[in-house]
Amino acid sequence: MLSDIIRAVILGVVEGVTEFLPVSSTGHLLLVGRFFNLGEGDFWKTFDVLIQLGAILAILALYFAKLWRIALGMFSDPAAQRFIIGVLVAFLPAAVIGAAAGSYIKLFLFNPWVVCFSLIVGGAVLLWVDQLDLKPRHHDATTFPVLMYFYIGCAQCVAMIPGVSRSGASIVAAMLFGADKRAAAEFSFFLAIPTMVGAFVYDLYKSRADLTTDHMTIVAVGFVVSFITAIIVVKTFLGYVTRHGFQLFAWWRVVVGTLGLIALAMGR
């Protein structure tokens, strides 16, 4: 049990650090499980999804005042209504494709080779976009055009391939359609809420018969650790990308992906 608690802490830290960075939390969790013998097995695959709720609650805590104002204006404030519609429009493509093809994606694409190649390709794309001479027109994540929300949602679907990064795909799309770096990052946080809650509920329902009391204790530990870690990371991340952009994260992806391919080629 103690060794499982230690695993939960390590994986909770990995989830909290990587969930909102454009580096792919799913990819990192899969690689950590493979190369360090942590988190392998059916329960740990479910665990990886369930602890994402801790990271999502970190966003709700950090943006509580803004999200509460939007919720209060749901029936009276046109701006709040427009943003809620925008988030739902952005969420819809992933919901449809996830429901239709999620099991096939997990069966055929959830392996370390796919993760490593996706990390490298995604890093190259992120590096390219970060160096473009873009002229941002949208500086508030709650006021994007509705069609722009839809395009971002379509881009997020690519992140169903492990290693691509949900936040990375949505950030790149938002920047290409005119968002500044901070607004792009913030909308990726907001879009994560329905996306990850949906994945959490779906996996919890599928695994409900297999989760024991001991399992729930382990999940609770990972949940709390991911929550605390995500709060620290998000607050730091926004300030960093506003000043320095995404190059650090692009190279992070390339280095991790390359090292992963080398390890796999050596038979690890």
Swiss-Prot record:
Membrane-protein topology: Multi-pass membrane protein
Enzyme Commission number: 3.6.1.27
Top EC class for this record: hydrolase
Source organism of this protein record: Rhodopseudomonas palustris (strain HaA2)
Record field: transmembrane: 9-29, 47-67, 83-103, 107-127, 144-164, 184-204, 218-238, 246-266
Cystine crosslinks: none
NCBIfam families hit by this protein: PRK00281.1-2, PRK00281.1-4, undec_PP_bacA
GO CC annotation terms, alphabetical: plasma membrane
Protein name: Undecaprenyl-diphosphatase
Gene: uppP
Function per UniProt: Catalyzes the dephosphorylation of undecaprenyl diphosphate (UPP). Confers resistance to bacitracin.
Catalysed conversion reaction: di-trans,octa-cis-undecaprenyl diphosphate + H2O = di-trans,octa-cis-undecaprenyl phosphate + phosphate + H(+)
